[in-house]
Regions:
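Single conserved hydrophobic/aromatic residue that forms the stacking wall/gate
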Residues: 143-152
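Loop-to-helix transition at the N-terminal end of transmembrane alpha-helices
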Residues: 27-41, 53-65
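Generic alpha-helical transmembrane segments of integral inner-membrane proteins
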Residues: 15, 37-45, 66-69, 138-139
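Hydrophobic alpha-helical transmembrane segments
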Residues: 7-8, 29-37, 87-90, 127-131
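Membrane-embedded alpha-helical segments in integral membrane proteins
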Residues: 11-23, 67-74, 142-144
Length: 152
């Protein structure tokens, strides 16, 4: 029964950001959201096989950077039209690299994140956790990834 609940949570965690992106009517936003989940789900495979969460936060940071720059590059017109978005992307990148490197170094130093001890053995629960991380990245980045893709 728990596996079904984890699966349902995973589905909704995926569909909600995809639905928001779809309703934006912008293909770049939808592709950025799909890219975020693709990265997380690919990273889940070795994490589950090797039963490790050591790259969980790092994957979130890499995904955040990828999504922000994907949206910026995909909507690039000229540096003069996008200077504000470029500055915002650079500031987001700085914050992401700072936080991601801190979390990655902490997990390397500690050896594990104790919260994952009971989660890792369950494929459905561990997958749900990776999917929710994809949701976190997409929902937090939606405000930025939708801005540079607007057409005035």
């Amino acid at each position: 029964m728990k596996q079904i609940i984890f699966f349902i949570i995973s589905i909704f965690s995926f569909l909600i950001p995809c639905g928001i992106a779809y309703l934006s009517g912008n293909e770049v936003v939808l592709n950025a959201v799909l890219l975020a989940f693709f990265i997380h789900w690919i990273a889940f495979i070795p994490a589950y096989i090797f039963q490790t969460e050591k790259f969980y936060d790092l994957t979130g940071s890499i995904t955040y950077l990828t999504v922000v720059w994907f949206a910026f590059v995909s909507s690039y017109q000229s540096i003069f039209n996008n200077i504000g978005n470029l500055i915002l992307a650079l500031l987001i990148s700085f914050w992401t690299i700072r936080l991601g490197s801190f979390l990655f170094m902490r997990i390397q130093k500690d050896g594990e994140d104790k919260r994952f001890r009971t989660i890792k053995p369950s494929a459905s629960q561990f997958f749900m956790t990776w999917t929710i991380s994809g949701t976190w990245v997409t929902l937090l980045s939606l405000i930025h990834i939708s801005e540079p893709t607007r057409r005035y």
